Design a protein with these regions (language model features):
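Adenine nucleotide phosphate-binding catalytic loops in nucleotide-utilizing enzymes
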Residues: 11, 72-83, 87-90, 94-202
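ATP-dependent carboxylate-amine ligase catalytic core
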Residues: 1-62, 66, 70-83, 105
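ATP-dependent carboxylate-amine ligase
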Residues: 154-157, 164, 169-341
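A short, gly/pro- and small-residue-rich
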Residues: 54-65, 85, 327-341
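Conserved beta-strand/loop subsegment of P-loop NTPase cores
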Residues: 61-66, 93-99, 263
Length: 341
């Protein structure tokens, strides 16, 4: 939680995350005299989304970032179904902001049904620049920036003020971040990038586009070819035992060539051995080497990740941040130096 004075506090949890946390948040916002409450809805499934948004928060402004194939068992197996699940969160007579390219018929139908105003946010005509002061964080994506600017403009916040606030904001633990450092035994130079929280292959592909512009792979530079680049991508794909549908997505993505720009990919988590067997049954295109690691030491894993590759290594975390992903991010944060583009 972030308070009006800029201070932060962890949300206390006695058990798993619950939408009931939003009830406490509303009471806390009222008790502190906040003028505006900004809350992230993380519900999965149409019924929970409807309860969280329409019964508890009842927002006057709702921002929806994208429609992605994730949590398929609860949200739906195709994007139209997922859009219908997300549309269940539309409150009555609210302003709904969505990137223009993410508009689905279900959103238009829900807006009409709830008497809400749908605002498709078109891509910005020019590159987003924060103006005077520090640049935006490496982890900021253009659709999210334009969405935030549109919402803030509707609330009377000037663009320069909004950009300055975003540029000075501390990145979330799970945001796209990069560190430089020396890892392994003997120490070797490496860039470590956390894209763990992107979760699904489509969101991760968007993150890889940003990563590729900053740290081109030895197999491809920003122009598509890189025979002279000695920078090797090594993927650390963290798989969760309770996200079987997501693991299957990653297995399919591997078979379709998702990792063709990677020299090596190391699978992590309990599903890793079974997932590796599936992947090896139909070797993915590109000649990428796949293996798994079942230890718990970030240091030992990094030693393995940066070994046996010439040039600079770019170690990219994908899949999920829970468990091994979180341990790696904390290790990189402790041992590395944050990369500022």
């Amino acid at each position: 939680m972030i308070f009006p004075d800029g201070s932060e506090r962890e949300i206390p949890r006695a058990g798993p995350a619950s939408i009931r946390e939003q009830v406490r948040l509303v009471f806390l916002a009222a008790a502190t005299g906040a003028d505006i409450l900004v809350s992230e809805m993380m519900s999965i499934g149409a019924e929970c989304l409807a309860a969280e948004s329409r019964r508890i928060l009842q927002p006057g402004t709702l921002a929806l970032t994208n429609v992605r194939l994730d949590h398929l068992d609860e949200m739906g197996r195709c994007k139209d179904d997922i859009a219908r699940s997300l549309a269940s969160a539309f409150p009555e007579r609210a302003d709904i902001f969505i990137p223009k390219e993410e508009i689905y018929p279900a959103f238009e139908e829900a807006a009409a049904r709830t008497a809400s105003r749908l605002h498709p946010v078109a891509p910005l005509p020019t590159v987003v620049e924060p103006g005077p002061g520090p640049p935006l964080s490496f982890g900021e994506f253009e659709p999210n920036v334009r969405l935030a600017l549109a919402v803030l403009a509707s609330l009377g916040v000037e663009r320069e003020t909004a950009m300055r606030g975003m540029a000075h904001a501390s990145p979330d633990f799970g945001s796209l971040r990069a560190w430089r450092g020396r890892f392994g035994d003997p120490p070797r130079p490496a860039v470590c990038v956390s894209a763990f929280a992107a979760n699904d292959p489509e969101s991760s592909a968007a993150a890889l586009l940003k990563i590729g512009r900053e740290f081109p792979s030895h197999r491809r530079d920003a122009g598509g070819n890189s025979p002279h680049v000695s920078r090797w991508w090594v993927g650390l794909l963290n798989l969760r035992e309770d996200r079987g549908d997501r693991t299957l997505q990653w297995i399919r993505a591997a078979g379709e060539g998702f990792f063709r720009d990677f020299a090596r990919v190391v699978l992590l988590g309990r599903p890793a051995p079974a997932a590796l067997r599936k992947i090896r049954k139909s070797p993915p295109p590109g000649g990428t080497s796949f293996s798994f690691y079942d230890g718990a030491s970030p240091e030992a894993l990094m030693n393995r990740a940066v070994s046996a590759a010439p040039g600079e290594r770019v170690v990219i975390g994908l899949g999920n941040i829970v468990g091994p992903g979180e341990r790696l991010v904390r290790f990189w944060d402790e041992k590395g130096t944050p990369h500022d583009p």
